[in-house]
Curated annotation (Swiss-Prot):
The modification Phosphoserine is found at residues 362, 647. The lineage of its organism: Eukaryota, Metazoa, Chordata, Craniata, Vertebrata. It is found in: Cytoplasm, Cytoskeleton. This is Serine/threonine-protein kinase DCLK2. Its EC number is 2.7.11.1.
Amino acid sequence: MASTRSIELEHFEERDKRPRPGSRRGAPSSSGGSSSSGPKGNGLIPSPAHSAHCSFYRTRTLQALSSEKKAKKARFYRNGDRYFKGLVFAISSDRFRSFDALLIELTRSLSDNVNLPQGVRTIYTIDGSRKVTSLDELLEGESYVCASNEPFRKVDYTKNINPNWSVNIKGGTSRALAAASSVKSEVKESKDFIKPKLVTVIRSGVKPRKAVRILLNKKTAHSFEQVLTDITEAIKLDSGVVKRLCTLDGKQVTCLQDFFGDDDVFIACGPEKFRYAQDDFVLDHSECRVLKSSYSRSSAVKYSGSKSPGPSRRSKSPASVNGTPSSQLSTPKSTKSSSSSPTSPGSFRGLKQISAHGRSSSNVNGGPELDRCISPEGVNGNRCSESSTLLEKYKIGKVIGDGNFAVVKECIDRSTGKEFALKIIDKAKCCGKEHLIENEVSILRRVKHPNIIMLVEEMETATELFLVMELVKGGDLFDAITSSTKYTERDGSAMVYNLANALRYLHGLSIVHRDIKPENLLVCEYPDGTKSLKLGDFGLATVVEGPLYTVCGTPTYVAPEIIAETGYGLKVDIWAAGVITYILLCGFPPFRSENNLQEDLFDQILAGKLEFPAPYWDNITDSAKELISQMLQVNVEARCTAGQILSHPWVSDDASQENNMQAEVTGKLKQHFNNALPKQNSTTTGVSVIMNTALDKEGQIFCSKHCQDSGRPGMEPISPVPPSVEEIPVPGEAVPAPTPPESPTPHPPPAAPGGERAGTWRRHRD
């Protein structure tokens, strides 16, 4: 027991003995005893208190450990780059095990072909007084400059930076705070002129030149130098930073306010000397194409004529940023006179035409933003309009339809809030066939009827044609049947009334539509819950002044005299209306090919053998069958007129029944017509009708079965309105398929709160 206690005492005595700096391990004991005698000589195991872990906790506090583990935030700049805002790194022993690891990460983040191409090799303090050689020398909240092998360059790196991320800033960073504070106060005083604006910056040099778009607002435009920095990062000049910006007028941008003036396009120059040549201020075709997608909408368009160093004059209006940029700028060439006649292909009634040097920032892929004229003087000395009536009156929205030759955008009347559709036709795509578009527009300009989709307003520029059209959201004729819960013979009678009413009006103007089909009959829903049909798509319409011979239309609805090529007139529309009436009551067409062959279909149409098969027609009134028989007469003279349809008892009186035949008719429609299948959006149906142009109708001009064996009697006479579709040569191949093309469709129409009975059909009286 005594021996054990002696050993313990000696053990603690040994602990109290501190090894001297000069002492060596393994030195002989002062007692001279052997290594096996006594506890001091036989290598006793130290107390657990001397283990590595216990020593750690004895010598380093939790606070010291936490301080070592905490990441230090520091900002790093590029040597000599005054426009670089700096990059903040959180530096900790866990993230960077060595100083070299930090250099590698900085190289990855800061180095490129222009800046630090040899990577980060050296780190200086912000004032360049010394080099940093270890992680321990980096201090919290400080800023440092990264370089390769070059000497430190004295630049005020912190001029445009407000390091709000730093904590307990001391020493050199006080200058950064002072500089940032002065910039902040300067911006605060002069922010009134900053409005959201999208500008285009083109890099100087050999064409083609890169162009970028930058959004400027109160959050992105803090100072002139900061905007230059953003432009430098975006434009990436080969020579490095952007030193100066010039407008297309040749005026140098010297302050932030210059960005928010009348100019939208700027030329970016580097350290090299800028060449003030005429070519620098002229945008070539490829640059115009880039600019065409720059601006989405504009609240107003102004015109000005400031002079530029070159011979041309340029001035542009600020762009309004309220959506995805999609419209275009262009520099079209035109020789048209602004004094053209209203009905000529060169101009449209009631609209001001932009001059030959004028420019429209709209096209079929973008929103209409009518920019200023490049030249304040138009053709023949006429000056451009001071503002765009179209943009002042309407608010232009997103694209809702995109076709082969036109796009359709949302269009809202600013004064009434009423929705319309803006149809934008690209003239470049209509080259050589402008007369077809003009013919269609000239007819739309003439017609004004409650059962016809109306052309509200039109405008023409040198590159685009803008048509504000009535927007019908209720889907087409098939949608009205398939989406309803109840469909009766009386509903079909009202639909035929609306169609006949439109045809009587058109035929009174000697206009034949030639493409009457369910897809072109749109359902207009009124606030009181009532509905009516509106006829659209006048791409094949023309004025009748004599027999027509072009074989065109949709095969299922084409009249026999069109196929026979004996000459036809207005009553081909009555035949098509008769086919539609037949379909409305049973769900399938009166003439159809079992093998889906067009030649068989045409043979049946020419024969004109009309049947009302049981059981589909057992519950249909005789009055309806009588009217259909009168409408589908092969003999044109015996065929009834639109006025006679309106006066027929089945249409004008209550001869129709109220029996619900929705399920039967819908089933047959889905069986025989692809476009009768359920669709997702009723608005897109109306948009697709508006989106079509006369150029889309070329596929509907085909040869009849007699086209190969019989010569044509002659070309159709050209009406006084611009040339019609008749001038298109008849192709050699027939279109496949009697089935009409697919078109999008709607949800069921909403119930009406009052007025007439919800869901009933209006009968407009002339």
